[in-house]
Amino acid sequence: MKDSFLFTSESVTEGHPDKMADQISDAVLDYIIERDQKAKVACETLVSNGFCMITGELKTSVYAPMQEIAREVVKKIGYTDALYGFDYRSAAVLNGIGEQSPDINQGVDREDGEIGAGDQGLMFGYACKETETLMPLPIHLAHQLAFALAQKRKDNTLPFLRPDGKSQVSVHYENNKPVSIDTIVISTQHSPEVSQKHLKEAVIEEIVYKVLPKEYLHDNIKFFVNPTGKFVIGGPQGDAGLTGRKIIVDTYGGSCPHGGGAFSGKDPSKVDRSAAYAARYVAKNLVASGVCDKATVQLAYAIGVIEPVSIYVNTHNTSKYSSVELEKCVKAVFKLTPKGIIESLDLLRPIYSLTSAYGHFGRELEEFTWEKTNKDEEIKAFFKR
């Protein structure tokens, strides 16, 4: 008997209010880290109707022009006209940044050159063989749709689109393998002049059928395009946005657990971010090496402590090796202290704006060092000993 089920993941465009906040926070981080690699940054952003507030904590000698940074991000996203509900020129930008507590910093920067974890917490990484980038198919497809919404808007293929938008894909699985797409949901902000009929037809033709892999498409896919019938008011005018509210979109679309810590606006001494990248690096290399077909990796840390307090590997019955053997391999092959992660993944670079929309994982950009599979041979060698 076939084990059959549907699994769903969603993504959002760069013009979604929560993603706007993520991008502003990461732009602030990039500006500072490019000029001060020793900086400690925890930047939170709120966007709402007509204004943006930047808050959080910093420890740096760098002056960051918050207004300029925020306005440039909003402009690049495409909020260039008050008719869109937000305009980079007229929106107020408020700066509420404070200084990092010395009580936190004393546990992070150590005299011996090591780095203690910036907080306690647990982080997860995941990889599987459903796509070439070793990501789950539903989130991979949802990101493709969300990215295409923005690209077709920016290149004027679909000039009636506006920046805010969401996508959702339900995939049909049989015996734990994806076989087809069952349902696609796309909600996109649009100009008031376009008819819903034309919008739906254009989105399906220009985005769905030109972007998604043909092997998963068929005539019976259920489409819901702007199912409420209208989406003119969007962006921060329609909903407030906050940094860190799209943590499942940012990761694996619900295919594995999440420790709860957001990424954007945090420098790599914060293990919420850097250890989640390391956990993906571990999981992806385990799958790429062939020792398993699927891997969930959990790392956990204590504030001010150098070594992780626990490492857990679950291969979902796809490996001939036990969790104990796999964990020994991970400890031998990967550097999982905060300093080891930062150095091995070269994280003290202004790369974070690239991560802040369309997923932190599964995009094999040169800057995304955690997506490299350069540890696969070491893993194979470990199990040949």
From Swiss-Prot:
Cellular compartments annotated: Cytoplasm
Binding-site residues, Mg(2+): 18
Amino acids binding ATP: 16, 164-166, 230-231, 239, 245-246, 262, 266
PROSITE patterns in alphabetical order: ADOMET_SYNTHASE_1 (PS00376), ADOMET_SYNTHASE_2 (PS00377)
Keywords annotated in UniProt: ATP-binding, Cytoplasm, Magnesium, Metal-binding, Nucleotide-binding, One-carbon metabolism, Potassium, Transferase
Cofactor: Mg(2+); K(+)
Pfam families: S-AdoMet_synt_C, S-AdoMet_synt_M, S-AdoMet_synt_N
UniProt record, GO biological process: one-carbon metabolic process; S-adenosylmethionine biosynthetic process
SUPFAM superfamilies to which the protein is assigned, alphabetical: S-adenosylmethionine synthetase
Molecular function in Gene Ontology: ATP binding; magnesium ion binding; methionine adenosyltransferase activity
Listed GO CC annotations: cytoplasm
UniProt binding sites for K(+): 44
Keyword Metal-binding tagged: yes
Positions of the UniProt region annotated as Flexible loop: 100-110
Entry similarity comment: Belongs to the AdoMet synthase family.
Reported function: Catalyzes the formation of S-adenosylmethionine (AdoMet) from methionine and ATP. The overall synthetic reaction is composed of two sequential steps, AdoMet formation and the subsequent tripolyphosphate hydrolysis which occurs prior to release of AdoMet from the enzyme.
Protein name: S-adenosylmethionine synthase
